[in-house]
């Protein structure tokens, strides 16, 4: 990796943001993770509006990362391991466009990397990858009670049965990339 002085931003949507956030909080080189919304038409959307499926927004995480420690490509490899990029507008029992698989890019380089990783990952999956690659739009941070949700509610039903297995898969598969 080339030496760069500033952090970079990655914005990823792979279903419920509680899952994605919990994984990336443990990734070495990721310095900040926030849950939020992007990709729709509503301004200042609320969780209830996004879950209602009328805003067009996806649940996403905004990652700040040090490219000297973890490459954008590595973040995407994690992303494609912790969710199913072949199911359109759903992850498990979470159904709707707000749960779509999407990569919002912040530069032409990120877009090229995302498309390359998708092409490579296509060989891993039996079904076609439906992940969207779109330019980043206005970011809306989710309500405070969604931030660091898994750490605050590890025994809550959804966290125990959906989030925890994804975190365990990350820990097993990417132990060399953990903090």
State where each predicted segment sits:
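Flexible coil/turn and secondary-structure edge motifs
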Residues: 1-179
